[in-house]
Amino acid sequence: MLTLARQQQRQNIRWLLCLSVLMLLALLLSLCAGEQWISPGDWFTPRGELFVWQIRLPRTLAVLLVGAALAISGAVMQALFENPLAEPGLLGVSNGAGVGLIAAVLLGQGQLPNWALGLCAIAGALIITLILLRFARRHLSTSRLLLAGVALGIICSALMTWAIYFSTSVDLRQLMYWMMGGFGGVDWRQSWLMLALIPVLLWICCQSRPMNMLALGEISARQLGLPLWFWRNVLVAATGWMVGVSVALAGAIGFIGLVIPHILRLCGLTDHRVLLPGCALAGASAVLLADIVARLALAAAELPIGVVTATLGAPVFIWLLLKAGR
């Protein structure tokens, strides 16, 4: 038994090391690649200072943090709701952030600065989160709280559809770009949004013990002495914050929160002591690689990153499911 535990521990360490190396390689490639290839030896030249440190580095950091936040949000929701299909958009938090952003675009008539749009997106996500917490205070079961989130998501989606229908052509282009996701406008002015993600990410990665209890199911978690009501509120609030900030930075990026935790579990990473940091590393790497493809696939334009993540990730996910089912 001890030998099996040691083997599993070594395997977990190997996975984390491999994911760390993958993320570092993707980080290096992201800083080098672009319209002009700039090798590490040229990073401290005047050209490198402009392209690498002022343009590519803030974008790369934003991509890493958003990818980690979305993947960890998916892992938290899947444990909290005992549903492998749970992801950040399921509770309506992503759509709530979208409603806040769309309201800011339409009411501000395109004149609001980026920081104001970011605050509106975070406010929309937190409003939906507060509504969910109000439901949670009524001590609803996990399944009913999940259904309440789905209903809120449908309402927010309907509001966004109405807003797009009545928007002008200029607003429509901005809204459609947001709905497909992208990091094209990110620079150091959004550093406050990046800093807003880091404390919550680090805190959640340290909560493996309650997460492991939640993954056992609601009844087992209560029997083990976990204050379920408290942890449900805290985790829903933390997820709402991360999703709101991510939407403010990059718009709507689907698929990552659903697939990354699922793929890691299929690879044997079921303990949240390993799964949570693994999701952060894998999510950051996946979104960063997708962002590189989005930048380089077309010479004259940039692809929406949400389309790239779905196109590249869906076949891999299907293959892993088929492989696991054999």
From Swiss-Prot:
Gene Ontology cellular-component annotations: plasma membrane
Any GO molecular function: vitamin transmembrane transporter activity
Topology within the bilayer: Multi-pass membrane protein
Family under the similarity heading: Belongs to the binding-protein-dependent transport system permease family. FecCD subfamily.
Record function comment: Part of the ABC transporter complex BtuCDF involved in vitamin B12 import. Involved in the translocation of the substrate across the membrane.
Summary of subunit composition and partner proteins: The complex is composed of two ATP-binding proteins (BtuD), two transmembrane proteins (BtuC) and a solute-binding protein (BtuF).
Protein's UniProt name: Vitamin B12 import system permease protein BtuC
